From Swiss-Prot:
Gene name of the encoded protein: argS
Subcellular localization, as worded in the UniProt entry: Cytoplasm
Cellular component annotations (GO), alphabetically ordered: cytoplasm
Lineage of the species this protein comes from: Bacteria, Thermotogati, Deinococcota, Deinococci, Thermales
Family: Belongs to the class-I aminoacyl-tRNA synthetase family.
Molecular function terms from GO: arginine-tRNA ligase activity; ATP binding
Name listed for the protein in its UniProt record: Arginine--tRNA ligase
Keywords assigned: Aminoacyl-tRNA synthetase, ATP-binding, Cytoplasm, Ligase, Nucleotide-binding, Protein biosynthesis
Bridged cysteine pairs (disulfide): none
Reactions performed catalytically: tRNA(Arg) + L-arginine + ATP = L-arginyl-tRNA(Arg) + AMP + diphosphate
Short name of any one Pfam family annotated for the protein: DALR_1
EC number: 6.1.1.19
GO annotation terms (biological process): arginyl-tRNA aminoacylation
Amino acid sequence: MLRRALEEAIAQALKEMGVPVRLKVARAPKDKPGDYGVPLFALAKELRKPPQAIAQELKDRLPLPEFVEEAVPVGGYLNFRLRTEALLREALRPKAPFPRRPGVVLVEHTSVNPNKELHVGHLRNIALGDAIARILAYAGREVLVLNYIDDTGRQAAETLFALRHYGLTWDGKEKYDHFAGRAYVRLHQDPEYERLQPAIEEVLHALERGELREEVNRILLAQMATMHALNARYDLLVWESDIVRAGLLQKALALLEQSPHVFRPREGKYAGALVMDASPVIPGLEDPFFVLLRSNGTATYYAKDIAFQFWKMGILEGLRFRPYENPYYPGLRTSAPEGEAYTPKAEETINVVDVRQSHPQALVRAALALAGYPALAEKAHHLAYETVLLEGRQMSGRKGLAVSVDEVLEEATRRARAIVEEKNPDHPDKEEAARMVALGAIRFSMVKTEPKKQIDFRYQEALSFEGDTGPYVQYAHARAHSILRKAGEWGAPDLSQATPYERALALDLLDFEEAVLEAAEERTPHVLAQYLLDLAASWNAYYNARENGQPATPVLTAPEGLRELRLSLVQSLQRTLATGLDLLGIPAPEVM
């Protein structure tokens, strides 16, 4: 990567100037000289010099790497212009994943209650979690993707109770999770709901004993059909009943009780409970005390989350795993009493949970620190995201106001089919093209925005072939693929024939790896999504460039040598778009 090599050279020169820092090199503004630039304002105080003088001194001291043509001080920046042939060679270099580095990153996402169909709110969780897992793997991390199955929770108990209580019989046609979800909604609308609580409690206890696992699994398998349709990937399923059976909660609480900040008050409102004082880690709390174990001996969900986190990071052991029989994910493993012992011992975790769970996630990190693992607490990340509206409406599964992911997929595919029919009536496989476009529209809309901002999914906007959409990027890929298909094979490119148009496109291609690394480091896919939008726009500008009313960048009819250069650039662009889309879990159609 030329940018990182330039950063290394600058860091070495600054070290010789007495400032051992590494500054980030960024693209220079288009109205300024140079391709890249480094800001030097932050060094003014330490060096007691104006930034302009620092820029000149750095230029004088810096041995320019061979791929840099010149360094130009611009105010408080030092800008760099790359040699065109070096720039082109780097842009044409085949893309490959970064070298693997040690240490497991565990990404937990989806983790939907196994009691009904997935709704629109779950879409963002799945799209974000799956994309960040793919991005991290490409960036050189060993990634494990985990889906947590809360089979001992109240929601699962209520659904199983409702199916029996109302004597509901599945017709074999309706998707089973939708059938189960209707029973759940019916129970919550039942005026006798409060009177039924003791019977629901009996089902809950049966779930805790692991007696109704197959009934829960039936709902889970139906949910997994949706996850598979969304192109999400998983490595492990962890069932809460197995966590209970393995005694992880008791082990975690015993470990925490060794801390002076975890105790059992003898009087006051917390009398008899096991309480954690989070104030040493989370200062400024109005009430720093959090109950882990109630006075009646029942655990709070804080405590369960903490125990699970301790297992993820190798502090506790006790879960066993075996292959999971299902038609969607051949290599998937599930926790089970009869499996083989396994602990991931992750050095870093990312829990994809909506922003409303920020406080519980902070308590998980606090528990790690108070248990004596402050370094692991720093590596326990929460990828928080805001809610999703559908055409301006808020969702509520309990009230039956949610729109299912299956319905969104079906409607988006129906609309995409009409668009494909209109734009390309001779398309060889309209159904597959519609599926790809629909998936691209849905998943891209869920990751293109910064996670902490609310999004409003609207079909017409998301499916547009123009603007900041998945289909816009997919269409750019298909256009590039069409040119390559017509070209057949070609010879070696003549880099010396490059025009400013090729140079500009090559410079944008160089930003791909930087976008991947930034998305991985910041743990947010929207950085990569925005890069793909910018690259697609750059490609469209290149494709449509005109001079004196004539096409300025013809590819197939260009002179020999330049034709090969342009084809090679188009190929690099096509591969970059395809790789980038795949890292977001989106297919790259060859024909649209």
